[in-house]
Amino acid sequence: MSQYASRSDSKGALDSSSPEAYTEDDKTEEDIPAPSNYLWLTIISCFCPAYPVNIVALVFSIMSLNSYNDGDYEGARRLGRNAKWVAIASIIIGLVIIGVSCAVHFSRNP
């Protein structure tokens, strides 16, 4: 007998069902976490009275989700970040509009 493994044993190590075939460096689609698409934030921003801006945020968020599903992880991350900032801008614009409306309404003399 030789001290080396036979060809059938070394071939079994390359089989995909063996635990030796999987390494930590192998990344599959299930291993990559989904980037944030901020859908919840864009839905909340839709309740603010800045309608063109918050609809754009919602579109960015949905595009981010679609990009992730298509396998474009960098595009999904970029679109999610855009959705976040546009939603924040929409909320700020909405709060300013509400504040100005309240100031005008309550500053009038009865």
Curated annotation (Swiss-Prot):
<keyword id="KW-0812">Transmembrane</keyword>
<feature type="topological domain" description="Extracellular">
    <location>
        <begin position="107"/>
        <end position="110"/>
    </location>
</feature>
<dbReference type="InterPro" id="IPR007593">
    <property type="entry name" value="CD225/Dispanin_fam"/>
</dbReference>
<feature type="transmembrane region" description="Helical">
    <location>
        <begin position="86"/>
        <end position="106"/>
    </location>
</feature>
<feature type="topological domain" description="Cytoplasmic">
    <location>
        <begin position="64"/>
        <end position="85"/>
    </location>
</feature>
<feature type="region of interest" description="Disordered">
    <location>
        <begin position="1"/>
        <end position="32"/>
    </location>
</feature>
<comment type="subunit">
    <text>Interacts with the giant stinging tree toxin ExTxA (P0DQP3). Interacts with Nav1.7/SCN9A. Interacts with Nav1.1/SCN1A, Nav1.2/SCN2A, Nav1.3/SCN3A, Nav1.4/SCN4A, Nav1.5/SCN5A, and Nav1.6/SCN8A.</text>
</comment>
<protein>
    <recommendedName>
        <fullName>Transmembrane protein 233</fullName>
    </recommendedName>
</protein>
<dbReference type="GO" id="GO:0005886">
    <property type="term" value="C:plasma membrane"/>
</dbReference>
<keyword id="KW-0472">Membrane</keyword>
<keyword id="KW-1133">Transmembrane helix</keyword>
<dbReference type="InterPro" id="IPR051423">
    <property type="entry name" value="CD225/Dispanin"/>
</dbReference>
<dbReference type="Pfam" id="PF04505">
    <property type="entry name" value="CD225"/>
</dbReference>
<feature type="topological domain" description="Cytoplasmic">
    <location>
        <begin position="1"/>
        <end position="42"/>
    </location>
</feature>
<feature type="intramembrane region" description="Helical">
    <location>
        <begin position="43"/>
        <end position="63"/>
    </location>
</feature>
<feature type="compositionally biased region" description="Acidic residues">
    <location>
        <begin position="22"/>
        <end position="32"/>
    </location>
</feature>
<comment type="similarity">
    <text>Belongs to the CD225/Dispanin family.</text>
</comment>
<comment type="function">
    <text>Probable accessory protein of voltage-gated sodium channels.</text>
</comment>
